[in-house]
């Protein structure tokens, strides 16, 4: 089926996945609050990442670094000088745009070229394309543009009681730098030898010029980042390892392989710190978008922090006697983006066999589903006994309890929020201590002893 972004966003709002931020005050541009189901979904995504990339990895450990860091961090990393977007203003509408994004949108919508990438073009090259193609502002309809200028993406604030330059600090634009400055602390305390990785999940902030597409591009977002340190010369081998590992993680969680692709960055597209980068992209209803950037950052970060701080980041290889600054592979995944990808991928509208009705269903992998099961008493008279099943299961799983409306409507409601299994407690359950378990995807029903429910669900949520 052809999926429509507006329909998916409507479902997300209607069913409590995502709400507009500050809604009662008219909202705040491009801010979103995760509702009861959305926070469960996103937490499950983060849990799945941590499980495979940290807990079950023989190489990696985790940290949780502070959002606010010494401003010298951002001088060393290059963010204060180089973390910019190309900005262009329409003189008639007074609206500011990212020059690369209005070019890419034009190429997609007017030329049908979904593979065009403007990132890496010079300001002059972008302005020439805008002028030659006659790209207009979507609001004013005119091509009356300013020159392209740099726009720093970091949010600035102040620490302490006075607002002057000596108290300037920044909300971090990425979680990576918190890992790099803690490299020696982790390596020493955990007695790690190369290769090894440090991962974390946390909020980052970028003052994007043109955020949009729901939760895909926002100014406040969450990252799941791994910095994997290795011997120089082995970085491409390890980059390939993490490309395969990341792709398999998505596949294991049932993200459509047909809707994902790996795209290598061209030489002129590479970031200043990278000698190789591959993006894992997903085909959203609005087009292809990056989920995961898997970059070889070389020794850029540790070397820069060593130069600015005076700290020696050399690694002493006891096997060879060599000393060197490790190279780093960074698989960086957007938690909000991949959550949106799982939501879009799971969305389906399908006919019901033997009926004129259709149903909306979210085919989440059980490990990601907000609720693993819903306990449904066939009658409110059975609620007192059915709640005991809920209490037993909810000690280990996220379980819904729903006693309102007909059983058919309750099935449809659970399908629409992605609950894999509905457990119906009926009058026979009082006698045989069994329940009817309905599968979300097949709609098949089986009779099962209540005592087997825990082991059944535990097996199903594995991935």
From Swiss-Prot:
Compartments it resides in: Cytoplasm
An MF annotation (GO) of this entry: ATP binding
Family from the record: Belongs to the class-II aminoacyl-tRNA synthetase family.
PROSITE patterns referenced in this protein's UniProt entry, alphabetically: AA_TRNA_LIGASE_II (PS50862)
Binding site for ATP: 206-208, 216-221, 290-291, 334-337
Subunit structure: Homodimer.
Listed Pfam families: HGTP_anticodon, tRNA-synt_2b
Protein name: Glycine--tRNA ligase
Organism this protein belongs to: Staphylococcus saprophyticus subsp. saprophyticus (strain ATCC 15305 / DSM 20229 / NCIMB 8711 / NCTC 7292 / S-41)
Keywords: Aminoacyl-tRNA synthetase, ATP-binding, Cytoplasm, Ligase, Nucleotide-binding, Protein biosynthesis
């Amino acid at each position: 089926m052809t999926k429509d972004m507006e329909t998916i966003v409507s479902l997300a709002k209607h069913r409590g996945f995502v709400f507009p931020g500050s809604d009662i005050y008219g909202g705040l541009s491009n801010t979103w609050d995760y509702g009861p189901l959305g926070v469960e979904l996103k937490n499950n995504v983060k849990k799945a990442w941590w499980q495979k990339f940290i807990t079950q990895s023989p190489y990696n450990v985790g940290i949780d670094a502070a959002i606010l860091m010494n401003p010298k961090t951002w001088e060393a990393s290059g963010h204060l000088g180089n973390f910019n977007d190309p900005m262009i203003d329409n003189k008639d509408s007074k609206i500011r745009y990212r020059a690369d994004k209005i070019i890419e949108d034009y190429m997609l919508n007017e030329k049908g070229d979904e593979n065009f990438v403007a990132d890496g073009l010079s300001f002059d090259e972008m302005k020439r394309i805008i002028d030659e193609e006659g790209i207009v502002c979507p609001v004013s309809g005119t091509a009356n543009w300013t020159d392209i200028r740099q726009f720093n993406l970091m949010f600035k604030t102040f620490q302490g009681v006075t607002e002057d330059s000596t108290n300037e600090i920044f909300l971090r634009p990425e979680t990576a730098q918190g890992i790099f400055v803690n490299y020696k602390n982790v390596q020493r305390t955990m007695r790690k030898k190369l290769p090894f990785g440090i991962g974390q999940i946390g909020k980052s902030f970028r003052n994007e010029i043109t955020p949009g597409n729901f939760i895909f591009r926002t100014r406040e977002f969450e990252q799941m980042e791994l910095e994997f340190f290795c011997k120089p010369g082995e970085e491409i081998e390890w980059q390939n390892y993490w490309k395969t590992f990341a792709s398999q993680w998505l596949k294991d969680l049932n993200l459509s392989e047909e809707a994902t692709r790996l795209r290598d960055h061209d030489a002129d597209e590479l970031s200043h710190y990278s000698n190789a980068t591959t993006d894992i992209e997903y085909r959203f209803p609005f087009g292809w978008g990056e989920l995961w950037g898997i970059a070889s950052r070389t020794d850029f970060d540790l070397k820069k922090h060593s130069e600015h701080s005076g700290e020696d980041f050399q690694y002493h290889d006891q096997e060879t006697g060599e000393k060197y600054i490790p190279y780093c592979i960074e698989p960086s995944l957007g938690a909000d983006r991949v959550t949106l990808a799982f939501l879009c991928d799971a969305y389906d509208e399908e006919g019901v066999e033997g009926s004129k009705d259709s149903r909306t269903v979210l085919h989440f992998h059980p490990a990601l589903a907000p609720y693993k099961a819903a306990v449904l008493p066939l009658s409110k008279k059975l609620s007192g006994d059915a709640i005991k099943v809920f209490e037993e299961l909810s000690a280990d799983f996220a379980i819904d309890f729903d006693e309102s409306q007909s059983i058919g409507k309750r099935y449809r409601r659970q399908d629409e929020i992605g609950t894999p299994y509905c457990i119906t407690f009926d009058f026979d359950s009082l006698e045989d201590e069994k329940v009817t378990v309905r599968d979300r995807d097949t709609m098949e029903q089986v009779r099962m002893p209540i005592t087997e429910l825990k082991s059944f669900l535990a097996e199903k949520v594995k991935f």
